[in-house]
Amino acid sequence: MAKQVPERSKPNAGKPSIRKVWSVNGHRLKRHKLLRDLVLIMIAPVLVYLMASLFTYSKDDPGWSQSGSAIVHNIGGKAGAWIADVLFQLCGFVAFLLPVALGVVSWIALFGSDQEEQAEGHLEPALRLVGIVGFLIAATGLFHLHLFQSDVARAGGILGKQVCNSLQAGFGVFGTNLFVLMLLLISVTLATGLSWFALMERIGRAVLAVPPLLQKSKRRADEWQHARALREEREEVRKIDAVQRAKRDPMKIELPPEPIVEKSERAKRDTQIPMFLGVNKRGSDLPSLALLDNPKPQIKGYSDETLEALSRQIELKFKDFRIDVQVVGAYPGPVITRFEIEPARGVKVSQISALDKDIARGLSVKSVRVVEVIPGKSVIGLEIPNVNREMIFLSELLRSKEYDKSPSSLTLALGKNIAGRPTVADLARMPHLLVAGTTGSGKSVAVNAMVLSLLFKASHNDLRMLMIDPKMLELSVYQGIPHLLAPVVTDMKEAANGLRWCVAEMERRYKLMSVVGVRNLAGFNKKVKDAEEAGQPLMDPLFKPNPDLSEVPRPLQKLPFIVIFIDEFADMMMIVGKKVEELIARLAQKARAAGIHLILATQRPSVDVITGLIKANIPTRIAFQVSSKIDSRTILDQSGAETLLGHGDMLYLPPGTAMPERVHGAFVSDDEVHRVVEYLKASAPVQYVDGVLDEIQTMDDGVVIGPAGFPESASGGGDETDPLYDEALRIVTETRRASISSVQRRLRIGYNRAARLIEAMETAGVVSPPEHNGDRAVLAPPPR
């Protein structure tokens, strides 16, 4: 039988677990608190009874010092009278301190014992009892020495008399005072644990804190006096201002006339929306204005009384900063109200501009914009937001006479100015536009309003668009309208290809205008139209027929405007980079006369996105609300956009000026955009141009547009160093056809370049020389 091995004893065997120790300590603490509450309940009535008996003591009551059958006047009855008599006879006036001392010591003993083992200064109950006895002896002695009377009950009692007589016999009166005072201090320390040195330190700190408190009180008193003087001065200024206001001319309040927007003839004609979009004759007309929502009645801004009171408040706020101004005019608008202020002599404009945030805080408004220079006036503008902001609908602007009478096919309806008048701009005069602002400032809505402005002004025969939408949200809704050159671009590599096609188209148009002898697209279209009406159409001077085919020159056609929309320019810059910046810069520099225009939008107005090269070639800019003055200077070269209100509030910098104009942008809903898009889809089929998004962009003469937008030399292409040589070699060896027209058609290049590629293959031994019928044999084997 195997020997049984005893189990090893655990090292902590026999020791109580932590949970058990906590449980025992918890029960013990609970019992201690219960006992403490019971003792407090018993002691409190005793102390109250003792105090009441002492305060109602009467010498006529029977007690320890006298007997009798008189009526007891003590509230504590016979026992109370007897106890009070004993205490007064023994302790004198100290009897009143006895209940207080017992109460203090009991409180310390009961509620100061939880941390008795950890905290210093807590003594044993026996020492507390010794302290109480010593306190009674010392107190009775002091009372007997300093409050001595013939009646012992009025001094320190019998106990005090005996203590003082015993000590005076040996130490005299001075020594007795010292010993009794020493006994009093020691007894208080034993009974309560009080440290006299700590008490003196607290008293010293309190004494040292008195002078700063006095100084602070004096400073507050001085400030109160100063504020009182300022209030009196302000009241005096108000009285003087009231007298001056009564004498001067009333403030000029120029209210906009009603109605602000006069309807055009087209707006009166387009009053009903077509019931069936599909029955519209294709290519017959522009979209009907009835497709857009009608404006709703809205609450106007400030009343005349409010404007008058607000102007006085503006003057008083400037007086608070020691600047004297006078409000001379108020011009309420749909979103903001401009107050024209005339500063006193010697007041700089910079002083007023530096107070824009303080004035906004004083007037309890979101922001205040200071217009430092108003052309034609010697006043300063102060633009304050209205309490009730009006919403501006796009239909109001498109129905206005300003939009309808604009002769340009590239008219943009931007919004309303501060007076409520429609603001329209000609993209052909800009000729390019940069739009920037933070998220939620109304930038995307403004771009949609610009697109609809162009669609309501020009048909697809007069206007073509290339839309680049990196976010795939804002411009993708226009997919399928006949105005598009290509589907809405969401791939940034295809965006670069589309921009290269625009550069190639720009170069082609310049060559056509040079041959025809005109300076811009309008002159070219007019000359083509006049030639057609005269029955002698102009032939394409750049047409090069294919020798293999019998082709005749094509007559020149009217060239449409091309507008390139880029919704988020910063994303495209991050993905494609420097290549796109060079293409955009090249278009911005030369594309105006060719009828090609750019509208760039970005929500990140930083210097790495809006570079100096782009700003130099796009002088027309629109800034929506931005977060800082730095962003505003990046867009407009000046501050101001950081004080805009958002939701379409913009600063429009027209071409050729340095003073931005404040415009409130129009709102266009998604439903309105969808209705217009469906109408255009039903009116004409989509007419995409082949090759717009191809990677290789080649002009009619075989010249390739390089990555930077510059045409490569024709003489440099067509040999084995040509970037298309490998692709042409693959096509020839796969199809087993060495045809110039086949290579030209497959690669979408010019005839001359395709011929040079075939000749390079002949030199390399890939194809044979041409036979008597012009055919070539493919000598190289097909690719595996």
UniProtKB/Swiss-Prot annotation:
Gene Ontology BP terms: cell division; chromosome segregation
GO CC, one annotated term: plasma membrane
InterPro entries in UniProt: AAA+_ATPase, FtsK/SpoIIIE/SftA, FtsK_4TM, FtsK_alpha, FtsK_dom, Ftsk_gamma, P-loop_NTPase, WH-like_DNA-bd_sf
Task performed by this protein: Essential cell division protein that coordinates cell division and chromosome segregation. The N-terminus is involved in assembly of the cell-division machinery. The C-terminus functions as a DNA motor that moves dsDNA in an ATP-dependent manner towards the dif recombination site, which is located within the replication terminus region. Translocation stops specifically at Xer-dif sites, where FtsK interacts with the Xer recombinase, allowing activation of chromosome unlinking by recombination. FtsK orienting polar sequences (KOPS) guide the direction of DNA translocation.
Subunit-structure text: Homohexamer. Forms a ring that surrounds DNA.
Protein location: Cell inner membrane
Binding site for ATP: G440, S441, G442, K443, S444, V445
Annotated PANTHER family: DNA TRANSLOCASE FTSK, SPORULATION PROTEIN RELATED
CDD domains in the cross-refs: TrwB_TraG_TraD_VirD4
Name of the protein: DNA translocase FtsK
Sequence ranges on the Cytoplasmic membrane side: 199-784
Signal peptide: none
Major place of residence: membrane
Membrane topology: Multi-pass membrane protein
Membrane-spanning residues: 38-58, 68-88, 92-112, 129-149, 178-198
Domain FtsK: 420-633
